[in-house]
Curated annotation (Swiss-Prot):
<dbReference type="InterPro" id="IPR001296">
    <property type="entry name" value="Glyco_trans_1"/>
</dbReference>
<protein>
    <recommendedName>
        <fullName>Putative glycosyltransferase YtcC</fullName>
        <ecNumber>2.4.-.-</ecNumber>
    </recommendedName>
</protein>
<dbReference type="GO" id="GO:0016757">
    <property type="term" value="F:glycosyltransferase activity"/>
</dbReference>
<keyword id="KW-0328">Glycosyltransferase</keyword>
<dbReference type="Pfam" id="PF13439">
    <property type="entry name" value="Glyco_transf_4"/>
</dbReference>
<dbReference type="Pfam" id="PF00534">
    <property type="entry name" value="Glycos_transf_1"/>
</dbReference>
<dbReference type="GO" id="GO:0009058">
    <property type="term" value="P:biosynthetic process"/>
</dbReference>
<dbReference type="InterPro" id="IPR028098">
    <property type="entry name" value="Glyco_trans_4-like_N"/>
</dbReference>
<comment type="similarity">
    <text>Belongs to the glycosyltransferase group 1 family. Glycosyltransferase 4 subfamily.</text>
</comment>
<keyword id="KW-0808">Transferase</keyword>
């Protein structure tokens, strides 16, 4: 079977510039390349050839300008059984016209069906041209069916995942060695390390962590905040917000480190060097993949109860979940707890790692996607298994897992 992945026009695949979608694609590609004739379309990048076949995968990199039209031309010249469009519903109709005999699966990684993103008529047209929609969280699924109730039967949650081999938990010999190496690299061997990793954007909330440092340092004068990321993935240039962050950090210059952009393959090492990771999202986060990463690394996790974050992180079971997400004092209080309540942190991190091992690896994500593909290609099989396919979990059983972990 011929399968096509169509990335967005934002970042290239493979994920040489980072990006949650691109990292997910990289993660599931080995599974699908061993089962299908897989072609991946993405934008050009100076570090990547225009076309190549690598590890059995055909990569086609097209100019960012007129990208969607260039993809459509490629589709016209090919014959794919199934086309997976990532996070660009408004491109679906164009691709369907270019390849009318192909089945189309659309995956949503943001609130792409909102009134701000498309008209009601455009949404109807998308639904007319897709065979199935997948979403990265129940939260995103609800944003679709609240506006388009008729989409409920074709909209399925497919959670993302991580590569466990890249995240040896901190309590293992390998994880401990990485932790020691990276703490030495940044000169923080004897510090209490708070980690933020992500785009430097107001919606991600790093400014709140800087604001919280005054209170944190009163209680923990050896604390250090490591802010890893740039204004736009691999773009380390400064904008007004980044300048604001640096100015805000000046009073704590000996306690805040800006690493700038970190390549995707180096991200796991930062999680291992941290004593606590904070996902300070202010917007309705679809479901931040950093939550999976922290849990996989066995790093104590603090996240905000925004969007889909609370679907995979349960308060005091696999992490600390903050409801008062826009208050520096809330972060300071949670971070203090992470530093002082070691019994709870040890319990949560072990639970979190088991949680990821059971449900949130890239193999789990790929198998869930494959079930979607097979249901599309084999219409008679209308029964769609629950999101947690490989262990026969459903939502009630995952809640039972949390209850069991908490007792």
């Amino acid at each position: 079977m011929k399968l096509a992945f169509i990335c967005t026009e934002k970042l290239p695949a493979p994920a040489v510039r980072g990006g949650a979608i691109q990292m997910m694609i990289d993660g599931v590609t080995p599974y699908f390349s061993s089962r299908y004739d897989l072609t991946i379309f993405s934008i050009e990048d100076p570090s990547l050839p225009k076309r190549e076949t690598k590890d059995g995968v055909h990569y086609i990199h097209l100019p960012k300008e007129h990208y969607r039209e260039a993809v459509a031309e490629e589709l016209r010249a090919s014959s794919f059984d199934l086309i997976h469009v990532f996070n660009r519903p408004l491109n679906v109709s164009l691709y369907k016209k270019a390849s009318p005999n192909s089945k189309i699966v659309l995956s949503l990684h943001n609130e792409m069906f909102s009134e701000k993103k498309m008209t009601f008529a455009q949404g109807k047209e998308v639904l007319d041209n897709v065979s199935m929609i997948t979403t990265v969280s129940e939260f995103i699924k609800q944003t679709v069916i609240e506006r388009f109730p008729e989409a409920e039967d074709i909209t399925k949650v497919v959670y993302s995942g991580v590569d466990l081999n890249s995240y040896p938990p901190v309590w293992t010999m390998k994880g401990s060695a990485v932790r020691k190496t990276y703490r030495k690299k940044y000169g923080i061997e004897d510090k209490k390390v708070i980690l933020f990793a992500g785009r430097l954007s107001p919606t991600k909330g790093p400014h709140l962590l800087i604001h919280s440092m005054r209170r944190i340092l009163q209680q923990h004068p050896d604390a250090v905040l490591v802010i890893a990321g740039g204004k736009w993935f691999s773009d380390d240039s400064e904008n007004q917000y980044v300048t604001y962050l640096r100015t805000l950090a000046l009073p704590y210059r000996d306690h805040i480190i800006f690493t700038k952009f970190i390549p995707a393959d180096d991200i796991p090492n930062l999680f291992l060097m941290a004593d606590v990771f904070v996902c300070s999202s202010q917007w309705n986060e679809p479901l931040a993949r950093v939550n999976y990463e922290a849990m996989a690394a066995g790093t104590p996790l603090i996240t905000t109860n925004r969007g889909g974050n609370g679907e995979v992180v349960k308060h005091e079971v696999t992490g600390l979940v903050i409801d008062s997400y826009n208050k520096p004092s809330s972060f300071a209080k949670a971070i203090d707890r992470a530093f002082t309540d070691q019994e709870l942190m040890n319990k949560m991190t072990k639970n979190a790692r088991k949680h990821v091992e059971a449900l949130f690896t890239f193999t789990h994500a790929a198998k869930r996607l494959n079930t979607v593909y097979q249901s599309v290609l084999t219409p008679k099989n209308k029964q769609f298994p629950p999101p947690f396919l490989t262990q026969n979990f459903d939502l009630s059983s995952i809640n039972q897992l949390f209850v069991k972990a908490k007792t």
